[in-house]
Design a protein with these regions (language model features):
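Phosphate-binding core of ATP-grasp and ATP-grasp-like enzymes
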Residues: 172-226, 231-264, 268-276, 291-301, ...
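Short glycine-/aliphatic-rich beta-strand segments at the starts of folded cytosolic domains
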Residues: 303-313
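Active-site nucleotide/adenylate-binding loops and adjacent lid/helix of ATP-dependent enzymes
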Residues: 102-191, 195-241, 357
Length: 359
């Protein structure tokens, strides 16, 4: 694989807050970023070197974009596959279209995890109401129906408890290809963020404990309260996934904690909300690490600078900014979004505590 030295231009598919923070991390390393996406006035466009506003299916715009950059990465996994494949035919795309395709489809993702020996909740493929009825009889009444595609922040899923509302649930999800998973009563949720470089070297951050509100990540704390053996196993799972995918870049693996064991939930082929604390809380942020990995630079240290806690500012939470800034030691990141809608991530704050003090 080709490495790209400082002075190269990185194309980023998607112009949201992740593209924004990637652009901010790339600049000190000597890289310029060109954002491509359909959204007018994207948050990343406020800090990136260049912006193209065009549809992901616009081949003319994609060709012009590809001719202006040296390599392409992405800020979210729901970029149309045809867009990524079109670009990959003419320019390096990292992570690969194959990694993206695995993450885009929940069934393929679960089958992949199972194929490498990673434990998952029991699941079944659903293509009809008949499939749903059969699957519930096999898995049990307490379950989660999820669309195979376009699911994030709690979207595209319905919790079921019995067969009374199967028809309605199937209709509510649009009667699209789905999976039914057994509902897992877990003790906690963690994520492991790992980076894999062009030469196959891998480094991971300590596991992160996550708490959600309304199915959206609310707070992340690192390091998670795990035993040394659990920490090693969680990192080993993320490492195994990255190696099996021949992955390049930052990868986030979400796991359910159940007793001493872990069950795979999903992976994100990109920088991740649960890693935002790393901007102030680690020697190398996840955003800088991603740039290093995709460009072939040496990976940076993932050592913690203290115990860290990241809290998302969602919707009207952003109105607390002045109060939060009055708190000593709070690090504020606003994403440049103008409208504070319900369930919209407007920014985040990070608090860093001495390693001897538990937040």
């Amino acid at each position: 694989m080709t490495s790209f030295p400082p002075g190269s231009r990185i194309g980023i598919l998607g112009g949201g807050q992740l593209g924004r923070m990637l652009s901010l991390a790339a600049a000190p390393l000597g890289y310029a970023c060109h954002i491509f996406g359909p959204e007018a006035d994207p948050p990343a466009g406020q800090v990136a070197d260049r912006v193209t506003i065009a549809d992901y299916y616009d081949e003319s715009a994609l060709s012009a974009f590809a001719s202006d950059v040296d390599l392409v990465t992405l800020e979210f996994e729901n970029v149309p596959a045809v867009c990524v494949e079109f670009l990959a035919n003419v320019i390096p795309v990292r992570p690969s279209p194959q990694s993206l395709a695995t993450a885009q489809d929940r069934l393929i993702e679960k089958e992949f995890a199972s194929s490498i020996g990673t434990g998952t909740a029991p699941y079944r493929a659903i293509d009809s109401i008949s499939d749903l009825q059969t699957a519930m009889a096999q898995i049990g009444p307490l379950s989660v129906l999820k669309t195979r595609r376009m699911g994030y922040d709690g979207r595209g899923q319905i919790i079921l408890n019995g067969s009374d509302y199967l028809d309605q649930a199937w209709q509510d999800l649009g009667e699209v290809p789905s999976i039914l998973e057994s509902f897992i009563t877990f003790d906690g949720e963690i994520s492991v963020i790992a980076a894999r470089s062009l030469d196959g070297s891998i480094i991971a951050y300590p596991p992160i404990a996550n708490q959600h509100r309304n199915n959206i990540l609310n707070t992340s704390r690192v390091p998670a309260s795990l035993t040394t053996e659990q920490t090693q196993r969680a990192i080993a799972i993320a490492t195994q996934i990255a190696e099996a995918l021949d992955y390049v870049g930052i990868l986030a693996v979400e796991l359910f904690v159940k007793g001493d064991d872990f069950l795979f939930n999903e992976f994100a082929p990109r920088v991740h909300n649960s890693g935002h604390w790393s901007i102030e809380g680690a020697v190398t942020s996840q955003f800088e690490q991603h740039i290093r990995a995709i460009c072939g630079l040496p990976l940076g240290s993932t050592d913690l600078l203290g115990r860290a806690e990241m809290t998302n500012l969602i919707g009207s939470d952003v109105n607390q900014v002045l109060t939060l800034l009055a708190e000593p030691g709070v690090h504020l990141h606003l994403y440049g979004k103008t409208e504070a809608r319900d369930n919209r991530k407007m920014g985040h704050i990070t608090r860093i505590f001495p390693k001897t003090i538990r937040p």
